Amino acid sequence: MTAFHSSPRMLGQKQDKFWLTVGLCALTAALIFLPFYLLDGGFFHYAGDFNSQQISFYRYMNGFLKGAGYPAGYGGVKNTFSWATDLGSGTMNAYSFYLYGSPFFWFSLLFPQNWLPYLMVPLLVLKFAVAGGGAYLYLRRYVKDPNFAVLGAALYAFSGWGLYNIFFNHFIDVLALFPWMLWALDETIYERRHGWFAFWVAVNLLNNYFFFVGQVLFLVIYFVCKLSAGEFRLTPRLFGQLAFESLLGVALGFVVLWPTVLSVLQNPRTIDLSSGWGFLTYSKPQQYLAILLSWVLPPDSPYMTSIWSEGIIKWTSMTAYLPLCSLAGVVAYWRARQGDSKKRIIAVCMVFALVPILNSAFYALNSSYYARWFYMPVLILAAMTVSAWEDPSLDLARPARSIAFVMIATLAFALVPVQDAATKEWSLGVLQNPGQYCAVLAFGLGGLAVYHCICRRWQQRRVFARRLLAGVLAFSCLFGIVHIGIGKFGQWNTDSDLVEQYINALALKEDLPEGDWRIDTYKTHDNLGLWLDKSCLQYFGSTAAPSILSFYPALGVKRDVRSQPELSNYALRGLLSVRYLLTTLAHQEQFHAEADEGWTYYDTLDGYVLYENQNYVPMGFTYDYYLTETQYEDTVTPTRSNLLMRALVLTEEDVVAYGQYLTPLPTAELNDLTYTRYTQDCTDRRASACTTFEMTSAGFHAEATLDRANLMFFSVPYDDGFTAYVDGQETEILRVDEGLMAVLCPAGTVTIDFVYQPDGIRLSRTVTLAALPVFLLYTGHFAWDEKKRRKH
């Protein structure tokens, strides 16, 4: 098909270098990870998000989508609702930010579930190889010698952004796939090729909707800067083709985009806007210095800073560093070229980086600061650098000295006098982590020294590109090992037993008593519920069911990127049907000191100590009383969990429609919120609980016997994607307790089925299914047309 064939200009010499680039990037990535892979016995673990989320998510979702765990739901629907994700969440919406649309994740489904922890490094190697290959294809257009395109691809793949974001893992998917889309845009603009751009738009959209928003903005900047520089002529036909393929690509990815958008719009973290001065300036001066130096110095570890004590720095992916040379090549290019589109693109990106409202435009105007879009200008910086290297007339050594001076100037942060406000004693330096700073500065200056030497000795010789490539790859390998090591061993005191706990959890999964209930953990590693395939109160993940983000805060429980209700909130355990709590032998005494009297020792299994909740209430129960949301919000926050064991919270509208089935809670009952009364409330709720409750991979099935018509409450996060069936008849679902669900059931023995399909999936699936034949016909037409032209 013509739409998917390289033009003659791209074949031959270029194709050989493409596979060389892929191989070199794969080899370099493998060498970076090899020491840690061997140290960890194949189960590579790093720190923070990589350990807590990425390993767990990849392994869990591999089994979930293959049907491991819970049975299919009502009507045969399956694999749409994950019980192990927080209190339960729609799978597509919870994981589309992390992996649901990633081609690398879907590739990993070829392997058994238990292999996944050991495949994290091979998958990362593959991602870096794909990143290098895509960057090579893009950069080949802008150099005469393909060896410099190989160099640029290495600069991009092993940039500071690439190494930093190993910590987040799924960000590397974005690094890998973006250059292919930019290459496809160039092919459309310059070669008038058809199909590739639509295809890569769809792939990048499916891969990560969050990053796709920023990619759209960057493509607009890229297109306008190139057009304004006169690098191509925009005709009505070209504009129409670009518009059509853009829309077609979005339509192909619409199956994931639309349900995710509907879910994300309910997430407070995505719609919290800044205002006033917050639009225009950062609140801390250090933020500006950090942004500027992040383009010059090698990156710190994601969770600790070398210099900065203020500003939003950690976990932001704030780095645009190019390995070995930093911005030395960029400065040489900048001085030599006039009216160049790449200079315009970088200038615009720098303005966007320094103005909060413009920076947040890459994330749909979210107020949280991130620099996770820097990988896109990094590709342009790599293009500028290799273009400068290819020009023998440019002075490459002088800019290296200028960048080195900027790096050396940061010693001021280490040498500035500081007087302690309390003791009045003087000391030197404001560094937050002197050891890491020394390592970063040493690599920055050392890289420039090697680069300066290579330029002075070999710039005018044919081996220049090969010497630079050797330097870039060697530097990337060494710095990559040190960078990962700083982050990994910085948390070694807490993460050294991570593999043991996760492996023990797999054994415990087989030894737990049968039944469908929730668990809680105390001072274990994150996301243990994903390894046990159980809904767990302790969960670390940004994109769980949005209603959780209203339910928990109403109880005074913080819910930002994790759910972590305090052990002291004992009533929450009864409300949410927690039956067992897990801790380790090392923390058993500490648990005894903190826990209420409602826990009794159950057993010690597979390295864990289990406690049973004496106030456990099976999931699905009824109430005698109700409260309005207004009354509920007027109560004291710390004891609201106790109150929810006594009365159901209804909206004003639902009180009108369903209040007849319950009695308004007497005023006197609002105050008796002691532990003793809580145990009685649990007994009352237990008496009306469902006789059967079965979790499914699409919701749940329940059976109950009621002496009168009543609202049956389920501590499952409300979601517009749920459909409820009572005795086979579709029934309205009530949003109660500011985020959970209830349904009206008649008197007698009833069966209840909740079935989940992502809200908006019917429309999104229809759009994508309609777009597929359009895409095939579109590309097929131009393939046939090209074939006819070749014959003649």
What residues fall within each predicted segment?
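Membrane-interface helix-loop junctions at the exits of transmembrane helices
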Residues: I32-G41, A68, F107-N114, N147-N169, ...
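Contiguous transmembrane helix-bundle modules in multi-pass membrane proteins
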Residues: T188, R192, F211, K342-Q501, ...
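Membrane-embedded helix bundles of polyisoprenyl
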Residues: C25, F128-R141, N147-S228, Q241-V261, ...
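Membrane-interface coil-to-helix junctions
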Residues: T28-G132, A154-A176, V264-R269, W277-Y321, ...
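Membrane-embedded alpha-helical segments of multi-pass membrane proteins
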Residues: P122-V130, I172-W180, V216, Y321-S326, ...
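Extracytoplasmic/lumenal acceptor-recognition loop(s) of multi-pass membrane glycoenzymes
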Residues: L87-S89, N93-F97, F475-N493, L508-V578, ...
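Active-site-proximal, structured, solvent-exposed surfaces of multi-pass membrane proteins
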Residues: R9-M10, K14, Y661-H792
